[in-house]
Structures are given as structure tokens and as C-alpha cells.
């Protein structure tokens, strides 16, 4: 794997078990910045609970890597997860089940892995959790960037932005058609939701200016429609940083523990 895809692996002190649960946590940074080291605290906490925990880097969209996009990043994660499990096994920690999670961009990538790529995983994906990750790209939902105006100008801007994100050529005439869903499906976790989707915990800020809050409503509705066990925590007074609703923020972290105990119990 390339430099960008190196991973940090945290393994528990107890080596006596026949198998372990793996939790992958993907870093935030708007697909352009960030590093697995940013999540050392989260990874150490997961490890202290008895999990094998891993942070994975992915190639960031930049002047050096103008070809990087959500799709290429998601494919790097897809390739990296089996390598993480193989390394854990080599160290004496065979993996029998896993969860994947992340913040913001990392949450977007975690959902894509759990919803789109679970059948390629080295162990069953039992759950996904995360905060403020985009799961679909409909211009009418992206008022945070003024892309919901329905004008020639705003549609052109939306086509440009979403095209870069997907690594596809998107033209405004695609909006509102099934061809648009087809073009964006590989980067839209929403479009992979079905009855077999992994239990999902997610938190979103109602005043998010960085990614689309309305997209999270669509996701909640899709998970509900397909009977997927999930919790959708809305921070009514917060933006992307989930900074103004201490009670709900605390509830999100409590729910992480609940979900791990329920879906990925440490035996």
C-alpha cells in the first residue's frame, strides 16, 4: 500500500482470546486534510475496551493529488481493511467481526464501506457509527453552499462540485434523473441502503454549513423504510462541530458504547 494508506493498529493487552472484534475509525478533514493520528484518543479508547482498533489513511484531494476523490478514497479503504485484519491476525489477534466508523469525511467513507462493500469485508460488518458525514448529493439538499437555488448558475456550481467529489463528469441536465443516481451511487451511501444494511448510529448538527443536514433526513428515512436498526441523533443548535448541544453530544457517545456492547460484544 502507498504512503497515504498506511494504518495504525492498536491491539489489546489480552492475547488469550480465540478471536477479536475490529473497529476501524476513519479520520475527518473534508477529504482534503487530516490524518489517522488525529484519532489516537478514540483508537486508544476502543482498544482499552478490548477491540483491535485501526485508523487508516487515504490519499487526500490536493494539488499533489488532483485525481483523488471520494470514490478513489473509498476504494483505498476497501482494499486496506482486509490488510488490517491480516496484520492483526499475524500479531495473534484473529478478527471474527468488525465495525467501521468515522467523523465527517471519515463518516462518509465508513458508511460507504458498511453499506456498499460489506460483502468484501474480512469479517461480518456488525455496525457503523459516525457523525456529520454526507451520504447523498442532491443540489436541493445543499443549501449550505447555495446549491439549492435551481438557477443555471447554482446548478452548474453543483454539477462542478459533485463531479469533483465523485470523480465523474456531471452535467446539470442529469439532476432529477435516475441517471444522476447511477452516476453518484458509488459515493452515495444512501443509495445502498437495503434490508441487510448494518445497524447505524449517526449524529448530525441541524445548522451544519459544511455538509448537508437535509441529506441526513433522507438517510434516516431510508433506514427507517428498510427496517434497519438505527439511531439518528440531531443536535438542534449545532453546526458541523456539534458544539452547542452538550446533552445530545453526550448521548451520542453513550450510544456508541451501547451499540458496541450490543452488536460487537467483547466476550
Predicted regions and their residues:
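Alpha/beta-hydrolase superfamily serine-hydrolase fold, recognizing
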Residues: 1-267
